[in-house]
């Protein structure tokens, strides 16, 4: 995979999470970053600083402790045991309003690893250290034990959502463990996590820049003429990454972020497109275009890799146009922006023809 410019990751994040285009985050657009660690450190610093001004969230947590005055519920079993001893304490279970919440633990742990990283500048480390004092009552946690799927967002903690997503990208996509069980940040983000960001970026880009194309993820029903319930239940769901719609036509974009976008042919020495990707996009197109009108197009949009043999191309498969395109995330942002705009404009022209 070609090396991504930190600034391009910022632009991708700013589309994926619109809050990064607002308030103090807007200044990031004019700032240069020599690596992604400094970029993340600054976004995290700004986000947490803003949250501190609003107030870090607190939650009620149940505690059980031996205390001298009754508080909450008396734990009879343990209290009776205590009476046989000194008898000056009683065991109670009570709720405590605390800063030591799961989300605050994630914020503190993320700052901790950014501060430990050799890639983060000392100036940014010092700024993060200044924020750590607000988390003195918050525990550090093992990044691998964070239950990300359990986080729930509501009106009071909605501002945490972007921060948690960014912390997930850092702690889940960059943390490396050594044989001694210690952790450190990797040089690059894990491809799987970058794939998810790449996909979300393209979807949100078209939603913002071309709202008339109604960019959305869509579930496609299998075009079955006769199938029993067992067959239907065993079929995988077909959900597109991005579907653009204009007039009576649709363009299905399958976003791909891989280390390699071509493979060696088993029949010759030449490079070929990955067959599984072509089969997938063709299945999406054919099942959406049930009437065989040719009004549904498909596109594989790869993040450009270092594969020199990769060529963009397009063809008509059984009446439907299928294209293979690349997006060079290591280049200038204006070129990325121009490429995405060209894809949208060409689709609109094709649909209007």
Where are these regions (language model features)?
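Glycine- and acidic
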Residues: 25-26, 149, 184-189, 261-270
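Terminal, charged accessory segments of proteins
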Residues: 1-183, 353
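Short amphipathic alpha-helical patches
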Residues: 67-72, 133-137, 190-194, 229-230, ...
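Catalytic core segments in nucleotide and nucleic-acid processing enzymes
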Residues: 191-353
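Contiguous, non-catalytic segments that form substrate-binding/exosite surfaces or channel walls
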Residues: 165, 175-180, 185-186, 190, ...
